[in-house]
Amino acid sequence: MFTINVETRKEQGKGASRRLRTANKFPAIIYGGNEAAVAIELDHDSVMNLQSKPGFYDEVLTLVVDGKETKVKVQAVQRHPFKPKLHHIDFVRA
């Protein structure tokens, strides 16, 4: 079981996403179920360490958003074309 602490995003858009990536974070979104979509930000290094482990893309993950646990699965991942960097992850509620 994987547990990741995340923060809700205060700003959205191209410039805000670039500032996140410069600060070694990246944007993501949680959607699905009966709740509204939530824009979040994740720490790049911690997710890179977790995603290299078996089961990260197959198992149900736990995201802690502002103290509230949400069960999700990875739906889509966007990566940098040639650097080992993540650009964005879509999570769908499990």
Curated annotation (Swiss-Prot):
Answer whether the UniProt record assigns the keyword Ligase to this protein. no
Keywords annotated in UniProt: Ribonucleoprotein, Ribosomal protein, RNA-binding, rRNA-binding
The record's note on quaternary structure and interaction partners says: Part of the 50S ribosomal subunit; part of the 5S rRNA/L5/L18/L25 subcomplex. Contacts the 5S rRNA. Binds to the 5S rRNA independently of L5 and L18.
Q: Briefly, what is this protein's role? A: This is one of the proteins that binds to the 5S RNA in the ribosome where it forms part of the central protuberance.
Point out the signal peptide segment: none
Q: Which domain of life is it from?
A: Bacteria
What GO terms in the biological process aspect are recorded for it?
A: translation
Any one GO CC term of this protein is: cytosolic large ribosomal subunit
Return the Pfam families for the record.
Ribosomal_L25p
Family matches, as PANTHER family: RIBOSOMAL PROTEIN L25/GLN-TRNA SYNTHETASE, ANTI-CODON-BINDING DOMAIN-CONTAINING PROTEIN, RIBOSOMAL PROTEIN L25_GLN-TRNA SYNTHETASE, ANTI-CODON-BINDING DOMAIN-CONTAINING PROTEIN
Task: Answer yes or no on keyword Amino-acid biosynthesis.
Answer: no
Query: Where does this protein come from, organism-wise?
Result: Erwinia tasmaniensis (strain DSM 17950 / CFBP 7177 / CIP 109463 / NCPPB 4357 / Et1/99)
Please give the SUPFAM superfamilies that the UniProt record associates with this protein. Ribosomal protein L25-like (SSF50715)
The record's annotation in HAMAP family points to:
Ribosomal_bL25
Name the family. Belongs to the bacterial ribosomal protein bL25 family.
> What GO molecular functions are on record for this protein?
5S rRNA binding; structural constituent of ribosome
Q: What is this protein called?
A: Large ribosomal subunit protein bL25
